[in-house]
């Protein structure tokens, strides 16, 4: 059997650089190398692209993926399908955060006319920006917690007014979040005005736009979605924390979380969550994969929190474990995602790009 040529892209110029490398390690160790020939492209923190061909060995340490011993390559040469480079059946971007999960890299693949795993430009960019995402959810009629949003320039000019708005509209605790980051980078739980100001200063180090959300005493429930025009969902899973909130350190450093799969919820609540996950998927025009995150209160009130257009594949990650519970193994999940990328690419080829006069 002729192997399909796959290129995995990871790293990136983002605060989530290390998370991306960890995700790449998991995917590289899970992908079926009898079916796929796998090349990798590592993007450094400075934005340089480094490529290695035909990865066959197990990656035992993430340091093995930090490529420093090859020359920086031209992007078009590394990826193009013409005479400048190898023809790839699909590219698998495992980039988290800005410059990778926000539609920018997807736009590059579109221009180069290469099939790629995951969401397109619109879905990736709207899922990355928490404010845009919330506005799309609101238009779809999905229930959300109260929030406000503002820019760094607005806060510098109207700090007192914005603090007053938070105090008037929301009640403590609140969560301060950069609008365009994931993996809980830059997020703070604030219990009073002093902590609020500190949290705002922290979050503005990572983004020019913030979202401040109402805190709630609720369970954190997640649903995985897989597919293109006819997506499927998993039974929900629950993030059980031994910390105040599910931040970057507890996710990737301390291991102070547990994933309960499936979550202990009434059947009707589980079905509602699955249906809402599909609605969120459609609201942002997603394709390939999404993880939809929810809050569920003790009286079974459900609020959508966000969708993650490129959920992690680390040992702690919910997305692959939710599909494992449904009977879909890591290798089969990866193969399915690659097939979905090719399916979407073939569908796009049906579009006309010139007008017949």
UniProtKB/Swiss-Prot annotation:
Domain ATP-grasp: start-end pairs: 134-339
Binding site for Mg(2+) 2: 306, 308
PROSITE patterns with a match to the protein in the record: ATP_GRASP, DALA_DALA_LIGASE_1, DALA_DALA_LIGASE_2
SUPFAM superfamilies linked: Glutathione synthetase ATP-binding domain-like (SSF56059), PreATP-grasp domain (SSF52440)
One GO biological process term: peptidoglycan biosynthetic process
GO terms for cellular component: cytosol
Binding positions for ATP per the UniProt entry: 167-222
Alphabetized Pfam families for the sequence: Dala_Dala_lig_C, Dala_Dala_lig_N
Cofactor requirements of the protein: Mg(2+); Mn(2+)
Keywords tagged on the record: ATP-binding, Cell shape, Cell wall biogenesis/degradation, Cytoplasm, Ligase, Magnesium, Manganese, Metal-binding, Nucleotide-binding, Peptidoglycan synthesis
Signal peptide: none
Compartments where found: Cytoplasm
GO molecular function: ATP binding; D-alanine-D-alanine ligase activity; metal ion binding
Record: residues binding Mg(2+) 1: 293, 306
E.C. no: 6.3.2.4
Enzymatic reactions: 2 D-alanine + ATP = D-alanyl-D-alanine + ADP + phosphate + H(+)
Cofactor: binding details: Binds 2 magnesium or manganese ions per subunit.
Pathway linked to the protein: Cell wall biogenesis; peptidoglycan biosynthesis
Function: Cell wall formation.
NCBIfam families xref list: D_ala_D_alaTIGR, PRK01966.1-2, PRK01966.1-4
Family: Belongs to the D-alanine--D-alanine ligase family.
Record protein name field: D-alanine--D-alanine ligase
């Amino acid at each position: 059997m002729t192997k399909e040529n796959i290129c995995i892209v990871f790293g990136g110029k983002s605060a989530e650089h290390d998370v991306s490398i960890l995700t790449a390690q998991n995917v590289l160790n899970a992908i079926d190398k009898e079916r796929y020939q796998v090349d990798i492209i590592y993007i450094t923190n400075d934005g340089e692209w480094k490529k290695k061909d035909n990865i066959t060995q197990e990656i035992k340490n993430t340091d093995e993926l930090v490529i420093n011993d090859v020359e920086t390559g031209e992007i078009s040469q590394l990826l193009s399908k013409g005479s400048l480079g190898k023809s790839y059946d699909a590219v698998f971007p495992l980039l988290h955060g800005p410059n990778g999960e926000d539609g920018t890299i997807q736009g590059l693949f579109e221009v180069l006319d290469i099939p790629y795993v995951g969401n397109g430009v619109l879905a990736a960019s709207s899922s990355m920006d928490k404010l845009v995402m919330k506005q799309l959810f609101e238009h779809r009629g999905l229930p959300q917690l109260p929030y406000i949003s503002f820019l760094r320039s607005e806060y510098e000019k109207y700090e007192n007014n914005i603090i007053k708005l938070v105090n008037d509209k929301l009640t403590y605790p609140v969560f301060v979040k950069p609008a365009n980051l994931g993996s809980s980078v830059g997020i703070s739980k604030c219990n009073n005005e002093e902590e609020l100001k500190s949290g705002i200063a922290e979050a503005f180090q990572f983004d020019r736009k913030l979202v401040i959300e109402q805190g709630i005493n609720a369970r954190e429930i997640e649903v995985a979605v897989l597919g293109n025009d006819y997506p499927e969902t998993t039974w929900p899973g629950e993030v059980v924390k031994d910390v105040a909130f599910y931040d970057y350190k507890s996710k990737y450093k301390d291991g102070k979380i547990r994933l309960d799969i499936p979550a202990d919820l009434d059947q009707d609540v589980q079905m509602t969550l699955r249906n809402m996950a599909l609605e969120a998927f459609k609201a942002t025009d997603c394709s390939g994969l999404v993880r939809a995150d929810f809050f569920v209160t003790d009286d079974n009130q459900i609020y959508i929190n966000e969708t993650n257009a490129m959920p992690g594949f680390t040992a702690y990650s919910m997305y692959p474990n939710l599909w494992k519970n449904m009977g879909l193994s890591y290798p089969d999940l990866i193969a399915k995602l690659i097939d979905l990328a090719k399916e979407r690419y073939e569908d796009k080829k049906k579009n006309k790009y010139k007008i017949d006069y």
